[in-house]
Amino acid sequence: MPCTCTWRNWRQWIRPLVAVIYLVSIVVAVPLCVWELQKLEVGIHTKAWFIAGIFLLLTIPISLWVILQHLVHYTQPELQKPIIRILWMVPIYSLDSWIALKYPGIAIYVDTCRECYEAYVIYNFMGFLTNYLTNRYPNLVLILEAKDQQKHFPPLCCCPPWAMGEVLLFRCKLGVLQYTVVRPFTTIVALICELLGIYDEGNFSFSNAWTYLVIINNMSQLFAMYCLLLFYKVLKEELSPIQPVGKFLCVKLVVFVSFWQAVVIALLVKVGVISEKHTWEWQTVEAVATGLQDFIICIEMFLAAIAHHYTFSYKPYVQEAEEGSCFDSFLAMWDVSDIRDDISEQVRRVGRTVRGHPRKKLFPEDQDQNEHTSLLSSSSQDAISIASSMPPSPMGHYQGFGHTVTPQTTPTTAKISDEILSDTIGEKKEPSDKSVDS
């Protein structure tokens, strides 16, 4: 059924509606907070919670406005879907920390959910980069194979380098994906250990579970960020149109700062800077450390929201002829089928590697040609030169996708690859047919 006139013009009224809803929520929330302050004794804990709430009220509208603008101008789903997921990190972090600051007893549960979303953000940032590259450069593997060999960064510089091409692409994606598996697993283990009374968060001791889980999470997180950095280093030139440095710093700083400041606070507890002499309204020193971490995050997320507003701007995706209903854009934001397919693909590839089966080739080779000769062939060089010489957008859009991507018409990398593959096979058949005729 076609949309009515009201729904067809949803872009005109959705933003004022959201602004009105937010103002109403402010009118309701502020008196409740004031009433809460009058009901309780105003101590350090309550003051910290109230100040954090002010930053929360400043953070959420900035983040939600950028998310809403992406939904209004939802013209390139393969790029904007991971961006929207990344933008949700700031309000989730801020709201989660504010709740944990108010109710320290449930801090372990809400904080672990926040940390799981952290892994989800790193995965989506990698997905954003790969989606852009595979759409603009369907022959990405050939481009990688034509590049000079990239060595590992310190401290892995002694390890043998990953082969340029499909191997490097697969291992970088797998290195990021492993963190999205390790982090939820360690989160579940942390919850179980908390119920058993052996977690002891914030206390560096090899007699509790928290220390071991921190080490595991840290190693997994560092390797995921290392794979992201290596991926960017190799494809720096191809990624330059989307200005990935600012985006990478936003993701990296939020993830690393939140993690390492928790480690620093735990060290302050260990050396006695934060001691039982000053716990204020908190029951234990560990609760003070957790509350301090949550309070700092509420302030940091306000700065992160401003940074995200500029680095993940919606403006490059504004198109003159926009299509799609509000329901399509809103539902697409919650669609996780791409993640399911990606995880299934990586699991199958790891399984084939473990069983010793050969990897599936994205680009078939002739039996009489090896990797070196195929890269030197004219067809490969033409494909690389064509992909590298695509003109930039005169309107500032990210182009090279063949046509404007809308929720109704979304090109897939597989279709583009099939077209290139069929053209290549057709070119190979023509000389053989001529030789037979002669």
Curated annotation (Swiss-Prot):
Biased composition (Low complexity): 374-390, 404-413
Entry-linked Pfam families: Solute_trans_a (PF03619)
Compositionally biased residues, Basic and acidic residues: 425-438
Keywords tagged on the record: Membrane, Phosphoprotein, Transmembrane, Transmembrane helix
InterPro entries assigned to the protein according to its UniProt record, in alphabetical order: Ostalpha/TMEM184C
Subcellular location: Membrane
Keyword Transmembrane annotated: yes
Modified residues (Phosphoserine): 422
Residue ranges that the Swiss-Prot or TrEMBL entry lists as coiled coil: none
Record's bilayer topology term: Multi-pass membrane protein
Region called Disordered, residue ranges: 358-438
Domain of life: Eukaryota
GO cellular component, one term: membrane
Main localization, broad class: membrane
Chain segments annotated as transmembrane: 17-37, 48-68, 86-106, 179-199, 212-232, 254-274, 287-307
Protein family membership: Belongs to the TMEM184 family.
Function, in words: Possible tumor suppressor which may play a role in cell growth.
Protein's recorded name: Transmembrane protein 184C
UniProt organism field: Pongo abelii (Sumatran orangutan)
Taxonomic placement: Eukaryota, Metazoa, Chordata, Craniata, Vertebrata
